[in-house]
From Swiss-Prot:
Its cofactor is a divalent metal cation. Gene3D superfamilies: Nucleoside Triphosphate Pyrophosphohydrolase. One of its GO terms (biological process) is ribose phosphate metabolic process. Pfam families: NUDIX. InterPro entries: NUDIX_hydrolase-like_dom_sf (IPR015797), NUDIX_hydrolase_dom (IPR000086), RppH (IPR022927). Residues 8-159 form the Nudix hydrolase domain. Belongs to the Nudix hydrolase family. RppH subfamily. This is RNA pyrophosphohydrolase. It comes from Bradyrhizobium diazoefficiens (strain JCM 10833 / BCRC 13528 / IAM 13628 / NBRC 14792 / USDA 110). GO terms for molecular function: bis(5'-adenosyl)-pentaphosphatase activity; guanosine-3',5'-bis(diphosphate) 3'-diphosphatase activity. Keywords: Hydrolase.
């Protein structure tokens, strides 16, 4: 097995889905290897980029696969790739031990549909549910709801997209 320091980062995308009131979609994770406590179980949709896939296409696909949402308008993109490391204690189990963390490209999108379009229990494309529930949350609260090792990424995403938040 490769040393933790030598492992690559998994290439991923993240999506900040913002409603007409400026609130952000967050989903309560269904558990998984990263689950460390019951207070930091919320996150925005995110997932891997397929080989040869454009990051914007990947963002729309991941959003659909996790929320069933297709009614969006692109608002912005964080210019840099944001990186986080997963704790060494779970690195051997997460992603079959192939990655030390993720490098993410983040997009902000306006939700133009109705809340009834959102379905996290039976998401689009027949994919396994990653969330067990969801809610709209003020953007400024997001870093405090995410698992601690992802917090710096969320702080940067909130900073980049803060002008899109509710008044």
């Amino acid at each position: 097995m490769a040393r933790y320091e030598d492992l690559p980062y998994r290439t991923c995308v993240g999506v900040m889905l913002i409603n007409a009131k400026g609130l952000v979609f967050i989903g309560r994770r269904a558990g998984g290897i990263e689950h460390i406590d019951d207070t930091h179980v919320w996150q925005m949709p995110q997932g891997g980029v397929d080989p040869g896939e454009d990051t914007w296409a990947a963002a729309k696909r991941e959003l659909y696969e996790e929320t069933s949402v297709r009614s969006v308008e692109r608002l912005g993109e964080v210019p840099d790739w944001l990186i986080y490391d997963i704790p060494r204690t779970v690195a051997g189990r997460a992603w079959k031990g192939r990655y030390r963390g993720q490098r993410q490209k983040w997009f902000a999108v306006r939700f133009t549909g109705k809340d009834s379009e959102i379905n996290v229990e039976n998401p689009g494309g027949g994919h396994k549910a990653e969330f067990v529930s969801w809610r709209w949350e003020p953007m400024k609260n997001l870093p405090g709801l995410i698992i601690p090792f992802k917090r710096p990424v969320y702080e940067r995403v909130v900073k980049e997209f803060s002008a899109l938040a509710e008044e």
